[in-house]
């Protein structure tokens, strides 16, 4: 296996509280990266999840930003070089969906975590749409089987209907809740018996489905039920073919309980076996193949203050082709400057280590002193622009005001860094010069206020503003655009890139503007 073939870069996505961070932790446990997983919910023991590293995440018990982690993994019984797994744990909370959408541009496949009692939820649907748009293959993990939940067949029907994708179970639960005995691994034809709270799966038994041994292991009634279920599964669902999964036509389904470490190792073993290695990336100019000799990469996320003692920013760069080498000069395409990085890093959430070289599929953290924006491209000299990192039109708006005039410098710096990170969008109203912050959800306003105060020592206050939609406007004819801006002066604003934004305060104002100015184009994402 060469370096590219052994890479697996994927995101774990789900509705809030389906157990995504727990699943990430268990992967890290099997990858030997952590000795004990922080039981995510348990407040008596203040262990917090490894991948939730911001203060606010530790306080609230939810993930609010994507974290990047990598580890080597070799399934039991296999020899040779281990797989290099890069996990991106995303926030499930819908207020941070924007961060998750962007993360999906940097992965080759995804694992969707579904709560066995609740089934498909709103956020799961939305994320699946993004995967479909990008043709990203998905594996579905039905979690929390050790609690009373719904019938597995009902869940599979719901997955097909709600997510509009064909499914194929590769493992099957034996009972659930109190009666949960374990999982039959269809992919490897083994029986895995469940013992709660063990660090590893206790027994794996290769049994013939029709033998007496099965009755002895799980009980006669359960054994008969399992035989009937598997017969039905084989009758209803077509046999699993790796290619249909990779082309995103079929989603393999696994059952288990991430909290009790059950079904996770089967998922990981099968995942590294069938998941695609890094795929070609689309740039405006051409397709970029991972096997090309020259380095290319793009920035899909910027995070301020991984270390609160230093006001540092880290830009996350996904390597698309070639080989990234420390201290090599690379072209920063948007600025047209040559940059070198003396201390690029790779992550295990907050613990980071300096990296000498990185290959396609890897995520590298680059120290950023304000030169990067989301979507920037790095190359060895070629003019390339990677597409597909949109900002969506925000849903909620508020005026932001500096609450302490003595701290205006800290306030401005904090606001700039948080906006570069893509936490929210900032518009400056041309009419009154006030700053309007637009977000996807209420929680982001709290995060901005909290982080300004705790990371930048600056206080802000929010004031209400009545706005319906923000849309980016452009026209082929400059005079028409100027005329539009003069006529709609009180509604015009600029975003952080200096582009013209029309802030409509009602649907009526927006539709009238669209009718009166036929030659002006109104965009609801910033990627056009």
Where are these regions (language model features)?
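Structural and coupling elements of P-loop NTPases
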Residues: 1-528
